[in-house]
Each structure stands twice: as C-alpha cells, then as structure tokens.
C-alpha cells in the first residue's frame, strides 16, 4: 500500500482510479465531480448506460480523458452516526472495487478516501476500514495486485492516513 497526496484525476501510475460516486453515477461534488470534469462527456454517456449503482457496490467504465484506462465507481455510505450499517457498507465499497479490478485484470489501483467528504464519514474510522479491507483482500489474493494506492487531496486526511498506515503496511 502506498499513500500519495495529490489530485486523483492526475494520477498516471495505475490502471484504474476509484470514484467515490453517488447512486446515479452521473457526477456530483468532490472527487466525483472532478473525475467527471476531467474524463469528459463520454464518461457521463457510459455512466448513463449503467443505470446507477447501489451503496457498497462497484461498476467500471473507461477512463476517457483521464490518464488511466479505467474508472471504478463505488457508492459510499452517508454517515448517520454509525447506526445504519455504515462500516459494513464502506468495507463493501473497497472489497467490491478490488474484486471488480481483479476480474478485469487491473493490477494497479488508486482509491480516494471514500465517504469522508460531503458524506461525512469520520476520517479516522474510514481509514481503519479502508486499510483493513485492502490488507485482507490483498493477502487473500497474493500476486493479483502490483500497487494499491490511496490518493488524498488535503493535508488533514493525508495526515490521518499517514498516522494509521504504520500497522497496516504490506508488500505486494
């Protein structure tokens, strides 16, 4: 696992980036809006054909004008004080994104901090879930991934990830 403080739309060292999408898959705010803006109108056209995505699930499209071949769209949970299966749904986002990547022979993947922006998921809790799921998935599927990267846009989120990664380092 690797951390990178950057704009995920500019990451060019992976085969796919993960989009923290909404259920319509038609663009929105935060990382979702940025990915749609950079990828261009063909991404929106392909997303329309997917008929949305449920929370915790993942779907794949081409990357279009992005510097990656694919975008894996996943819909994270909206934080509701932890009483609405948010942790299981967030874990499913990471697990299902990795499973879809594996099915499509994607060996290098970059994740944003799913649900921690406008969806309000506490960053520390979200980080622990992300690391745990990725670590377990990669260990259960040895040799299937060359790089799993977390691309974080702001200093505060990056610093939380940096603090939490210590006990979760794994070699791919």
Where are these regions (language model features)?
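Glycine-/small-residue-enriched capping loops at alpha/beta junctions
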Residues: 1-103
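Phosphate/ribose-phosphate-bearing ligand recognition and processing surfaces
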Residues: 78-172
């Amino acid at each position: 696992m690797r951390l990178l403080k950057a704009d995920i739309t500019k990451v060019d060292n992976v085969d796919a980036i993960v989009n923290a999408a909404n259920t319509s898959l038609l663009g929105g705010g935060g990382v979702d809006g940025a990915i749609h803006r950079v990828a261009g109108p063909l991404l929106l056209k392909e997303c329309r054909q997917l008929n949305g995505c449920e929370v915790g699930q993942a779907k794949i499209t081409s990357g279009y004008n992005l510097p990656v071949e694919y975008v894996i769209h996943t819909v994270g949970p909206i934080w509701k004080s932890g009483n609405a299966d948010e942790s299981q749904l967030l874990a499913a986002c990471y697990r299902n994104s990795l499973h879809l990547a594996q099915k499509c022979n994607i060996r290098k993947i970059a994740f944003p901090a799913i649900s921690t922006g406008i969806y309000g998921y506490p960053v520390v809790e979200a980080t622990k879930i992300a690391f745990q799921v990725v670590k377990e998935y990669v260990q259960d599927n040895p040799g299937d991934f060359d790089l799993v990267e977390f691309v974080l846009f702001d200093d505060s989120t990056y610093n939380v990830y940096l603090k939490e990664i210590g006990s979760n380092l794994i070699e791919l």
